[in-house]
Amino acid sequence: KNKFKGRLSLQCRAEMITDEFIHYASMLNVRLEFGLQTIHQNEGAAVNRKNNMKKVQENIIKVSDAGIEHEVSVIYGLPEQSLTSFIKTIQWCLSMKIPVIKAFPLMLLRGTDTEKKKHNWGLVESGDSMPVVIKSDTFSHKDWLNMSKISQSLKDTENNHPSLLEDLLKLGNESEIQFDRFQPFAKTILSPVTKEAESY
């Protein structure tokens, strides 16, 4: 009678889970959260988060086939990232029929290798109390705004993402970016720059 009846949310690396883990997870009320960040090896290497994409794909298919709720999170604003490479990461997630895709802006934590090397990539941060990377040598601020719009359209369509990338991008162009999703005081600082956003 004292069995746990709640729901578990477990953060996992997709390439690290085993068939045994998937078997037992399928017997629980569980949601798996996979921090993918990016499908691109150069971007992953820059933040010490390279993925074995073959294994990632195999395991996500197994999780889906087992009927386990799951989501994938990615990051925009990564070193060496571009608008095009970010879109390719999103396209991969859509092709895998991930039910919930979440895209978060990169925050540089003080003392990390990425923060120490930020000038190597020309990373520029916003000027608020919880700064995020908004520009680099490989993406402009306008590119970042368009990545933010894609992030917003993913938020707006959770559990019902369009199957086609083109439809998601169209929704992104129509989205109003809610910057305060990530930090409560960002809206007043960052929202005026949305006037600079361009269509993809």
What do the PLM-derived regions correspond to, one by one?
Residues A25-I39, P99-M107, K117, L123-S126:
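Non-cysteine beta-strand/loop elements that form the S-adenosyl-L-methionine
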Residues H119-S163:
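Alpha-amylase-like alpha-glycosidases and glucanotransferases acting on alpha-linked glucans and related
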Residues K1-E71, Y76-L78:
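Conserved SAM/AdoMet-binding glycine-rich loop
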